[in-house]
Amino acid sequence: MSKKITIYDLAKTLGVSAGTVSRSLNDHPSISMKTKERVISMANELGYKTNKFAVNLSKQKSNTIGVIVPKLNSIFMSTVLAGIEKIVNDAGYNLIISQSLESMEKEKLNAKTLYDSGVDALLVSLAYDTSNFDHFAHYIRNKIPLIFIDRVHNLPNCSTIIINNRLAGFEATEHLISLGCKNLLYVGGNIKRNVYLDRLEGFKDAMEKHQLDFDQTHFLETDLSPDDVDSVIHYIKSMKNAVDGLFVSSDNFAAHIIKALKRENYKIPQDIKIVGFNNDPISDLVTPTLTTVN
C-alpha cells in the first residue's frame, strides 16, 4: 500500500515550510502565484489529497446541509428534495436527509443529530404533531440558518418557503361550486399545520363568496392515512345533507376515498365530485381520474 502524501512530504520535496505548502493550497494572498503553482503541480504529481474535513473544521464549515421531512414516500416531498439536492450539490455542498415519520420526538432527535454533525444550515418541513420548537433553539442561538418549507412555523430570524395554500383551497372549492356542488366537505389534516389550516380558510372563503353556509360539520380533520378512510366514509354517510362535493388535502388519500365510495355504490362524479391536492401521479391512475391542485 502506497504511503499517504502529507503537506510535510510536499514541503520536504519542494524545500519550503509546511506552512507555505498549506497557505499555497488554500490560495492565501501572502503566497506568490509562482509558488502556488509550484506547490499545486507537485501535489498533483505526488497524488496529495486535501483533508477536506480538517480544512472545513478550521473554517467552522462542514459543507453539509441537513433536511428533515415528515416522510420520504411523498411524491411532492421527493420532488422538493430532488430540487434541493441539485441546488445544494451545484453549490459544492452535500445533503443529509432524515425523516421524522410524522413524530415530534423523532424530529427532535433528527435536529440534534444534524446539529451535532455540524451542518451549515437546516431545512425543515414539520412533523404532523410538532407543538414545541425548542429543539431548534441551538440553531437560532448559534446563527445557523434555519429554513422551514411547506409545513412551517414562524420563529425569529428563520425563513419560510410556502405556496399560497389559502388561494389553492379557494380555487379547488370554487371549482366544485362551479360544477353545481352545494353541500361540500373539506377533508384535511391537523390544522396546527399551516398547510391544512390555510386550505381550510380558502375553502371557507369560497363558501362565503358563493353564499353557502359553513359550519364545523363541513370540515373533517384526519391523519390523511388509509387507516382513516372508513371513518371518512362513515362521516359522509352520516351527514344530514348528502355531500355532493369533496375537497381532499391529499391526492393519495382522495384516491383511497374514491375506491371506498365506489365500494359503497356511490357514483363518482355523478353523486360526489372530488378534488385532490398535489398533482400526484396517482390522480391519473384512479377511475375516474382525479381532478387535483398542482
Q: How would you label these PLM feature ranges?
A:
Residues M1, E45, K86-A91, K112-G118, ...:
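Bacterial carbohydrate/catabolite-sensing allosteric modules
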Residues M1-S62:
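N-terminal helix-turn-helix DNA-binding module of bacterial transcription factors
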Residues T13, A18-R23, L57-N73, H175, ...:
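Short beta-strand segments enriched in small/hydrophobic residues
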Residues L46-A121, E201-K204:
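Amphipathic helical "hinge" segments at domain boundaries
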Residues Y48, L101-M104, A127-S131, N252-F253:
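Short beta->alpha connector loops
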Residues S131-Y139:
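Active-site-adjacent beta->alpha loops and helix N-cap segments on the catalytic face
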